[in-house]
Design a protein with these regions (language model features):
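C-terminal catalytic subdomain
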Residues: 277-396
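Cap/lid and interdomain-hinge subdomains that line or gate substrate/regulatory clefts
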Residues: 1-5, 39, 98-225
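Long, internal scaffold/assembly segments composed of regular secondary structure
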Residues: 213-214, 218-305
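N-terminal basic/disordered segments at the start of proteins
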Residues: 1-32
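Extended hydrophobic packing segments that form well-structured cores
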Residues: 351-454
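Short, well-structured alpha-helical segments in soluble
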Residues: 51-63, 237-246
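Short, acidic/small-residue loops that bind anionic groups at enzyme active sites
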Residues: 82-107, 116-121, 125, 273-289
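Periplasmic-binding protein-like
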Residues: 63-72, 91-93, 249-255
Length: 454
């Protein structure tokens, strides 16, 4: 994923302008080599009028991050003009210079010190680096904050659908629409279960046949499953896909039981797996079961950060001796998460004994885990990292074995003592720092599932 950054060098002409230009050029090259798209003024920002001109250009071209490159000392009028022109997060970058006993040629550090003071007075958030232009650590910091800025911007226009209400007794799936809208800017659309059922019953047989043929190339045993409920699951996939497209929804939270079993005679799990994976779609539509809207929103966040599908799962076992946690959901995981060394299968729901669910072990690799939790009555972000292990799946359906950064016992203690929800979401890759930065941007408290502190 390429992030769009406003690169804004600040230069006071009373300092060493040639050296400042050299440092600016090196920093620019470093950012471009890292894959960032840079938006910058034709000339460095040298005074308040040029800062105001640059601010107008930024306001007309939304970006994920403002990088203020303090090429020399400058007063705070310029940084404030730039900060107030954009809602993008701020990153201040100062460069060290040798202690030569001679002229202080740039005085960059004092510049960001003054900038930080002014930004704090005016309640602007920021992060910073004090390092040479080609220091590799600065790229990691900038990438994390740009990802956070991009995520915040995209969520403000996100739309999520809730199909039905969560089952009685599953308070962990409670919808607090005002809280989600106020914190993230997302819009919620409510959808009646009967609309899904009516659409599913009216999907043309030829459409279902075509989808079945495509799915046969991914799952090797569909012909061995009971065919009527299998076709029912595929019709649910198309019904939900149509609704998401027509209502411009980025994700769905679906009351998956008991009505899909009792009214349609099939499982919704396989349909939601296909949607979450982007099967036959322009982009994945993350789906959570039990109408868990916070789970869907968490999955969408992980999907947009990783540019890959996310999965909402139960935590169903802890092996303290082996330091392992078992993750499982009926058959909901995206097919792209299947272990590449094992053929995924179509399966039947473990309790209702109806298709279609997915049946495969999760592939090995590093994962980021997250949950938008409201266990305390207000939102916070539960966040951790770990590794899915190349081990046999602990249960039928879509399942895997996880080793966390903290011990399995510590995780169990956190899960139960904090009264956390029974669902957590994951995606492959490390997006921990980006999520920490995102939480900081929106003042969202973080509960870490890790020994590490930041």
């Amino acid at each position: 994923m390429q992030f769009r950054i406003a690169f804004l060098p600040l230069v006071r002409t009373t300092f060493d302008v040639p050296l400042a230009a050299e440092m600016t050029s090196l920093a620019r090259q470093h950012l471009q080599a890292a894959g960032f798209e840079l938006i910058e003024p034709e000339q460095p920002v040298t005074d308040l009028p040029t800062a105001q001109q640059a601010a107008q250009e930024i306001a007309a071209s939304p970006v994920d991050l403002l990088v203020i490159f303090q090429a020399t000392f400058a007063d705070s009028t310029m940084i404030l003009a730039l900060a107030e022109a954009s809602e993008a997060p701020l990153f201040l970058w100062a460069i060290p210079e040798p202690w030569t006993g001679e002229r202080l040629r740039l005085n960059s550090l004092c510049g960001i010190n003054l900038a930080a003071h002014a930004l704090t007075l005016h309640q602007h958030k920021y992060q910073y680096a004090y390092c040479p232009p080609q220091d590799p650590t600065v790229i990691h910091k900038i990438r994390a904050l740009a990802a956070a800025g991009s995520l915040r911007r995209r969520l403000r226009s996100a739309r999520l659908g809730v199909v039905g209400n969560h089952p009685v007794g599953l308070d962990s799936c409670h919808l607090d629409e005002a809280s989600l809208s106020g914190t993230f800017g997302v819009q919620i659309t409510r959808i009646d279960l009967n609309e899904v059922f009516t659409r599913a019953r009216n999907i043309p047989g030829t459409v279902i046949d075509h989808t079945r043929t495509r799915l046969d190339s991914r799952l090797d045993n569909l012909s061995s499953l009971e065919q009527l409920p299998l076709r029912g699951s595929l019709s649910v996939y198309h019904a939900l896909k149509e609704i998401a497209a027509e209502k411009n929804l980025d994700g769905l939270a679906v009351r998956c039981w008991p009505e899909f079993f009792t009214e349609l005679g099939c499982a919704a799990c396989g349909a939601m797996s296909m949607l979450s994976d982007g099967f036959g779609q322009e982009a994945p539509v993350p789906c959570s079961c039990e109408a868990d809207i916070n789970g869907t929103l968490t999955q969408l966040m992980l999907q947009w950060l990783s540019d890959a599908p996310a999965f909402g799962t139960d935590m169903v076992g802890v092996d303290a001796d082996k330091d392992r946690v078992a993750l499982w959901h009926c058959g909901l995981a995206p097919l792209s998460m299947a272990d590449v060394n094992q053929q995924p299968h179509g399966g039947i729901h473990s309790n209702r004994r109806l298709p279609l669910v997915m049946d495969f072990p999760l592939k090995a690799g590093q994962v980021t885990l997250a949950r938008l939790s409201q266990a305390t009555g207000s939102l916070r972000l539960v966040l951790g990292r770990g590794d899915m292990l190349a081990e046999p799946k602990p249960f039928s359906g879509t399942a895997g074995t996880l080793k966390l950064e903290c011990s399995a016992d510590e995780f169990l203690n956190l899960l139960i003592k904090e009264g956390l929800e029974h669902h957590i979401s994951l995606t492959y890759g490390d997006y921990f720092e980006a999520l920490i930065a995102f939480a900081g941007l929106i003042d969202l408290p973080v509960l870490p599932i890790t020994r590490r502190r930041w």
